[in-house]
Regions:
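Hydrophobic alpha-helical segments at protein termini of multi-pass membrane proteins
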Residues: 1-400
Length: 400
């Protein structure tokens, strides 16, 4: 790494605010890397403020969980509830692993992942049950067709979407763009489907025994495990588009409302295909193409996310923090594989260090993007800590 910044480092990088900022129109480049001869400072832990969910919210969800467990035991009995629970874990695992693939480039904080699943599985389901019961008692709505095609899409997507919006409000520094929105939305939807499947599987076992349970499990657990995840991911995508630009709560609410309309319509279309038409016919002509389109959209967004990571790391390379070769290694899937393979051949197998280097560099790129868009006043602190961490990790990787 050069001891003095290259010429490119002296040039302005538009739109970036840092501790070195001066009155406009001057806008400074990324902080210039110090000389490698300087001693490395102690490795700090990046600040977590604004990146997680308060513990009291988990306490509320825990209370609701106890109430929900009591409801299932009362309505289905212990045996049917346990059978439904075990079977419902299978599609939940399928969806969770799929979401992890989407989220592999820049993984979301574990506590937010847990909150998203818990909100869908506990809060959204509980609130949906309350609204459904109230509508039945107050308005006398008992039509299965109306419930499936109108009531369920509106009520369920509203409460699921609220969970995604809460994550944006309470941890917006971990909500960087549409991919994050899709991840959080899909996790909320997966949690909701998990609890809903417990009920469906339990009722099928009680009413039709093993034969009906098998049919229900195949249809809900194997043929369409991603349905709820896709619906709520639309809401998350809309909120994420706003999060990438400026992060205004009002703008996110407006975009979330538009995404919610899309989620409701897709949910209604999905339920309608099962209620009014030949399920298997429409499954292959409608639902499978929708799922394929969803996957292609995610692939395109992932590529855009990687391109943005590379662009931001190139800003730091221009200031001397990374070499061009390191940027290629850190900001491309192939480069990461090569880097991990190289680290495995070093003394003591240093793949954990390489993973930490990749993780911190990716987070650094996200921090810079938030700073450029002016939506994170804490970006300077995170940037400073992450730059120190990446230097220290590189030094550990190259140490003999």
């Amino acid at each position: 790494m050069a001891s003095t910044p290259p010429t490119a480092a002296r040039r302005s990088v538009a739109g970036y605010a840092s501790p070195l900022a001066q009155p406009t129109p001057y806008t400074p480049p990324a902080p210039v890397a110090p000389s490698p001869a300087e001693s490395l400072p102690a490795l700090p832990v990046p600040t977590r403020k604004g990146r997680t969910i308060s513990l009291w919210l988990f306490g509320v969800l825990g209370f609701l969980l106890i109430a929900l467990v009591g409801y299932f035991v009362w309505a289905l009995g212990s045996f049917a509830s346990v059978v439904g629970l075990v079977l419902a874990l299978i599609p939940l695992t399928i969806v969770f692993l799929g979401v992890r693939l989407i989220d592999r480039w820049e993984p979301e904080p574990k506590r937010l992942v847990a909150f998203a699943i818990a909100w869908g599985a506990v809060a959204a389901v509980g609130l949906t049950l309350l609204v459904d019961t109230a509508l039945t008692l107050l308005l006398g709505i008992r039509s299965e067709e109306f419930g499936a095609v109108v009531q369920a899409p509106v009520v369920e997507e509203l409460w699921k979407g609220l969970g995604v919006f809460l994550i944006f409000l309470l941890a917006r520094r971990a909500f960087d763009g549409p991919v994050d929105g899709i991840v959080y939305g899909a996790l909320v939807g997966a949690g909701f489907a998990f609890t809903e499947n417990i009920q469906y599987f339990g009722v099928s076992l009680i009413e039709g025994g093993g034969e009906q349970l098998t049919v229900t499990f195949v249809v809900r657990g194997l043929l369409s495990p991603f349905a709820h995840a896709m619906f709520t991911a639309i809401t998350g995508f809309a909120i994420g588009m706003v999060a990438r630009r400026h992060g205004s709560a009002r703008a996110a609410a407006g975009a979330g409302a538009l995404g919610l309309v899309g989620a409701i319509l897709l949910h209604a279309l999905w339920n309608g295909s099962a209620t009014f038409a030949d399920f298997f016919g429409l499954y292959f002509t409608l639902q499978v193409p929708l799922f394929i389109g969803f996957i292609l959209g995610i692939v395109a967004l992932r590529r855009e996310e990687a391109r943005l990571t590379r662009a931001r790391l190139e800003d730091y390379a221009a200031a001397g923090w990374f070499t061009p070769q390191e940027v290629t290694m850190l900001a491309t899937p192939g480069g990461r594989k090569v880097g991990l393979a190289w680290a495995s051949q070093l003394r003591g197998d240093r793949r954990p260090l390489m993973r930490a280097f990749i993780k911190d560099a990716t987070e650094l790129a996200s921090v810079r993007q938030r700073a450029i868009t002016g939506r994170d006043p804490m970006a300077v602190n995170d940037e400073r800590a992450l730059l120190i961490r990446t230097r220290a990790t590189r030094a550990a990787l190259l140490a003999y």
